[in-house]
């Protein structure tokens, strides 16, 4: 079984595995340290009965069954069945409009929840830091964890209307 890593709301369900490299997948929205964080659970064999977008799930509640679904021709072998898990930030709340403008004629079957619109955070590093903090009886801060990541590039923003900064003021 696959369970929710943290309490949150089901944001998206793809139950048509042929439409994504992720196969069947679920995206959950969590509010952690006062900003939205998403978890993605992919290659699911099946989504638990009754799971719906907008539904609130508690930490540890079963949401699916691990599997090997994908849209690739060769598929995922039984021996390689696994859960593809991501912790993400949403890149652009207007992604669908951007996609239509910049990739005209191409399909976007998942709208806002297209994998290209999710910025991944390494879950292994995050869980390790969280464990270290707990061992030292310290509070873990997701915001601090993200702020401590190496800077890969700097972006000059020419508008005060930059949505990323509005959604994540503590990260800018």
Residue ranges and their predicted role:
Residues 5-48, 76-82:
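Zn2+-dependent peptidoglycan hydrolase active-site motif and core
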Residues 8-10, 51-66:
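A structural signal for short beta-strand/turn segments enriched in small hydrophobics and glycine
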Residues 18, 49, 71, 92:
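Conserved protein kinase catalytic core
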Residues 52, 75-172:
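Acidic, glycine-rich catalytic/binding loops that coordinate metals and/or anionic ligands
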Residues 29-31, 65, 88-90:
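Short glycine-rich beta-strand segments
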Residues 38-48, 68-74, 104-110:
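Short helix/strand-bridging catalytic loops that position acidic/His residues to coordinate divalent metals
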Residues 16-17, 63-64, 69-71:
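Short, charged beta-turn/beta-strand-edge "cap" motif at the junction between a beta-strand
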């Amino acid at each position: 079984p696959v369970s929710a890593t943290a309490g949150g709301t089901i944001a998206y369900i793809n139950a048509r595995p042929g439409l994504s490299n992720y196969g069947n997948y679920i995206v959950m929205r969590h509010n952690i340290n006062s900003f939205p964080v998403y978890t993605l659970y992919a290659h699911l064999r099946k989504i638990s009965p009754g799971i719906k977008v907008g539904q609130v799930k508690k930490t540890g509640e079963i949401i699916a069954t691990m599997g090997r679904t994908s849209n690739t021709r060769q598929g995922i072998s039984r021996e390689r069945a696994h859960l593809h898990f991501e912790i993400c930030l949403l890149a652009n709340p207007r992604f669908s409009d951007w996609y239509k403008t910049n990739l005209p004629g191409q399909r976007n079957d998942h709208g806002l929840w297209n994998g290209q619109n999710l910025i991944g955070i390494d879950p292994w590093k995050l869980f390790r830091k969280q464990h270290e903090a707990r061992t030292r009886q310290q509070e873990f801060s997701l915001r601090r964890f993200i702020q401590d990541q190496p800077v890969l590039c700097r972006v000059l923003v020419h508008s005060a209307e930059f949505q990323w900064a509005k959604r994540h003021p503590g990260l800018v």
